[in-house]
Amino acid sequence: ANRLDIIIKNGYIGLALVLVVLGVFLSLKTAFWVAVSIPVTLLGTVFGLGLTGNTINLISLSGFILVLGIVVDDSIVIAESIHHYKSKEGNLYKNVVMGLKRVIMPVVTTIISTMLVMSSFFLMSGVLGKFIYVLPVVVLFALAISFLEITFALPAHLATNKIEKPFMI
């Protein structure tokens, strides 16, 4: 099997684990929307790679692996906070916004600091600079798309009247 097949297989396993763990501890709906954020971010990043004339290769796959944990973590942090605030009394939409506001600054700080660190890779010159150029491109696209997804799409999907209960607990 080639490397891409292995990464895709591991991606499916990771997606299943996210669904199970979040379904057990939060709700199936929350688990579903967090899981959806992963392929949305990855597909958006692939689209961005195409726009910049880059391709999927060993270095870009390394970038995907590197950033995937951050993308999943940010989605989980936002979703858990929204889930917590949705269970409180009051206006549902205000509670969703409060859940987002509670954790958005640490998430944004993480995203920006990672983007700054990865941007320094663009300063590398020579053969090595040309060789790893696609790594920060992947990370920057993924983080930017993930940021848009977790600040706009994820809260909108989780803003429903129904308070979901955990699947098992």
Would you name each region that the model predicts?
Residues 4-5, 79, 84-109:
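Helix-loop junctions and hydrophobic alpha-helical segments within the transmembrane domains
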